[in-house]
Amino acid sequence: MIRLPRLYQRYLLYLVVFVVIALFYFLQAPRVEEHIGFDLALPISHVDNLWFQNKGLEGFSNDDKLVVNIGYDECFHIGRFYEGCFNRHELKSTLTDGHQYLQRKRIHKDLRGSFGRRWFGKSEYLYYDVLYPALVDYFGSNLEKLNVEAVTGISKYPKDKSLPFMDVSITFEPISIELLQKRSYISDINILFGVDCIQPIANWTLQKEFPLVKYRYSEPAYLTYKFVGTRPVDTGAQRLQETDEGKFKIVQLADLHLGVGESECIDEYPKHEACKADPKTETFVQQVLDIEKPQLVVFTGDQIMGDRSIQDSETVLLKAVAPVIARKIPWAMVWGNHDDEGSLTRWQLSEIASVLPYSLFKFSPHDTHDNTFGVGNYIYQIFSNNDTEVPVGTLYFLDSHKYSTVGKIYPGYDWIKESQWKYIEDYHDVNLKFKTGLSMAFFHIPLPEYLNIESKTHPGEKNPLIGMYKEGVTAPKYNSEGITTLDRLSVDVVSCGHDHCNDYCLRDDSTPNKIWLCYGGGGGEGGYAGYGGTERRIRIYEINVNENNIHTWKRLNGSPKEIFDFQSMLDGNSPESV
């Protein structure tokens, strides 16, 4: 018989006790129902716009709902492997008789911030029940018998017709078609975390005066909500167009590394006594946007620092795009290797990004949930100011994935797949009516050709390089020959992120068109820097159609009004090296 050392015996005893406690909670505690849906026999949960007009509900649509109950579940979790909910607290527990007519929405964001961060512990989740306006008309006065009222307000202190809930008070009012014409009812609810959280969507309200709840080891949770009948401003996909001067300016935001809460700076340079990472990063971004006033902003990955976003990646995504949305600037986005390491998958993040105001983010027909093709491979053209049917430039956006899935053969980072290169090549050949003009491509992880410091056509000579080359290029070990596709598509400039302390542009001569391969340079204080001290920076591009040229320059966090490393990239006037 094998006898375990005393230390391991103790660990085994702890494990047995822990499993017994977990099983007790799982088997003995009352279970929580997850889904309460509409009775499918009711045909009027969705109606057309004419119905709303006839009822005097101008501005209403089937997207509108009435929040009629709010509650939260207490749960117990073991890592990310098991989570069981054993206790429920709700304001309208007497709604039992009307549940079959309601739809329950659970916000999968742990208010305690424990799930995903601790091996085991207690988690809490907010939920709310909604009723569609068409059902208000259908049931009429029976709603009062079912004790169905709707939420009209959320306040810090109790008011008339309000009920205490967590650290706030919720106000309920009776509902009817007539009252819907007069009162404002809350239609949808979400939660954002951190004292610096932002709600950039115009028809949503963020209650920042007081938190919904604040736990000791968690960022404060704030309610954000919208009212019925409020429509967002039309901010769908924008048509990209040159200015009257024949120019098109792009601000590239690389490696912002934002998270939930303000967080401390990492490798700040120059160093200050106190430094909050995200506020400093956001201020820098706002300054550059106000100075440059670009026609497009491109996020080139790692805008979200995954391990700082386990509580809620949506909060961080909204924080990243808020300065751009506030200035009504169209924006595109690709993902890096850290974005989906928080609470949301790449696909879930993409679903949010694709519908946000001024977003150009698109799914390709081949994008997959398992990321084998990546998520967010798309193309946009820039059109002439004189002839809106004639493009003057093309922009390609590709998902460069994360880490190699065949690490024993090709260790390190993943690569853009041959199927992705073929997709944009086929799209170019079939769907782009006009194929002339200046072209750029954006993704996160650099190509292997970023290592081509030495000339391929002139042995012993170096390729032109402008900017800072401080750290090793972490390109994938496998070469999917994307540079060949980019050359065939006549791409002039490629720009990526990933390596924070490199900000150079290299003119690679391994293909006939000699493509410029550029880094954006790390912009966020929440990511690494170092290498002797590296100040955060942002790169700007200006496509000049009249000159058939692309200019680029950069700005530093500490001196955003000054530019450096200016290049005219296609006229031969760039310095050979700096």
From Swiss-Prot:
Its EC number is 3.1.-.-. GO terms for cellular component: fungal-type vacuole. Keywords: ATP-binding, Cell cycle, Cytoplasm, Hydrolase, Nucleotide-binding. Disulfide bonds: none annotated. GO terms for biological process: negative regulation of endoplasmic reticulum unfolded protein response; traversing start control point of mitotic cell cycle. GO terms for molecular function: ATP binding; hydrolase activity, acting on ester bonds; phosphoprotein phosphatase activity. It holds the Pfam family Metallophos. CDD domains: MPP_Dcr2. ATP binds at residues 116-123. It is found in: Cytoplasm. Present with 1940 molecules/cell in log phase SD medium. Required for cell cycle progression. Has a role in the completion of START. This is Phosphatase DCR2. It comes from Saccharomyces cerevisiae (strain ATCC 204508 / S288c) (Baker's yeast). The gene is DCR2.
